[in-house]
Swiss-Prot record:
NCBIfam families associated with the record: PRK00228.1-1 (NF001266)
Pfam families for the chain: DUF179
Family note: Belongs to the UPF0301 (AlgH) family.
GO cellular component, one term: cytosol
Protein name stated in the entry: UPF0301 protein PFL_5830
């Protein structure tokens, strides 16, 4: 008997199908940070909030005026779970107090990365998110089987060099897909 290991989607994008009914994920592009037999974790990367880094720093460093640069660093809604918790995706390089290196990318969760970005000595490219998307064991696999998502290999250019409102379409184009031509009716071959 052949031993087949499961296929996991760590370091991939999930593209929400046009018929996605869940308002937390409709029209989203989600980067998958971790996916294994226990479940999955991801960050929505195309939903900026009405917050910027200056707003966050006012809470973290109330005695220090944030630089004007901080007003132009958006904060994204990373997902509906733990929306008070911050996550920073950035290229590999400096390691902060709480940094996990992924495949050519790092995820930092400590305040020092925010301070470094604010002070102009942090990663040149980053995405700051509050909250994350989480799936229990088997949940994401079931959603994929129900055609709720398309999967796309990660592309740093989409994450760091494409404006947030164009990321979903850019990921779909990476697959050769035009989302406006997709139907909610799908079959299984």
């Amino acid at each position: 008997m052949k031993n087949v290991s499961p296929s996991y989607l760590k370091h991939h994008f999930l593209i929400a199908m046009p018929h996605m009914a869940d308002p937390n994920f409709a029209q989203t592009l989600t980067y998958i940070v971790e996916h294994n037999a226990s479940g999955a974790m991801g960050l929505v990367v195309n939903r900026p909030q009405d917050l910027n880094l200056a707003d966050i720093l006012e809470q973290l460093r109330p005695d220090q005026e944030p630089s004007l640069l901080c007003q132009h660093v958006p904060i994204f809604s990373g997902g509906p779970v733990q929306t008070d918790r911050g996550f920073v995706l950035h290229p590999n390089g400096p390691v902060y107090q709480a940094t996990v290196e992924l495949e050519g990318l790092s995820l930092s969760t400590s305040q020092d990365v925010l301070f470094a970005i604010a002070d102009g000595v942090g990663p040149a490219k980053s995405l700051i998110a509050l909250g994350y998307a989480g799936w229990e064991a088997g949940q994401l696999e079931a959603e994929l089987a129900d055609n709720a998502w398309l999967t796309c290999p990660f592309d740093a250019d989409i994450l760091f060099n494409t404006s947030s409102e164009l990321r979903l379409e850019a990921a779909a184009r990476h697959l050769g897909v035009n989302l406006s031509l997709l139907t909610s009716q799908a079959g299984h071959a």
